[in-house]
Amino acid sequence: MARSLKKGPFADDHLLKKVDEAIAKNSRKPIKTWSRRSTIFPQFVGLTFLVHNGKIFNEVYVTDDMVGHKLGEFSPTRTYHGHGKDKAKK
């Protein structure tokens, strides 16, 4: 279910502060965050985030196509090892 339009998009305050500081300093340093639930705003375009996936931090470079999505969508939490292989054959 989508978020109500009258509520507007969500982003954690501490993340917005870090983004504003990075833009003000014109910093290229990645912004480390655990906030997978935050929506990507247009001001995030061109910045690099280190998004936690529960184990490590994945580097996410934000482009125009990502605006409106969540940061967590670009840092997968599960590892796919493929479907079962035939272990009995040697």
UniProtKB/Swiss-Prot annotation:
A single GO molecular function term of this UniProt record: rRNA binding
A single Gene Ontology CC term: cytoplasm
Keyword Ribosomal protein: yes
Pfam families in UniProt: Ribosomal_S19
Keyword terms of this UniProt record: Ribonucleoprotein, Ribosomal protein, RNA-binding, rRNA-binding
Record-linked SUPFAM superfamilies: Ribosomal protein S19
UniProt GO BP: ribosomal small subunit assembly; translation
Family statement drawn from the similarity comment of this UniProt entry: Belongs to the universal ribosomal protein uS19 family.
NCBIfam families reported in the protein's UniProt record: rpsS_bact
Function as written in the Swiss-Prot or TrEMBL entry: Protein S19 forms a complex with S13 that binds strongly to the 16S ribosomal RNA.
Name used for this protein in its record: Small ribosomal subunit protein uS19
Species the sequence originates in: Mesomycoplasma hyopneumoniae (strain 7448)
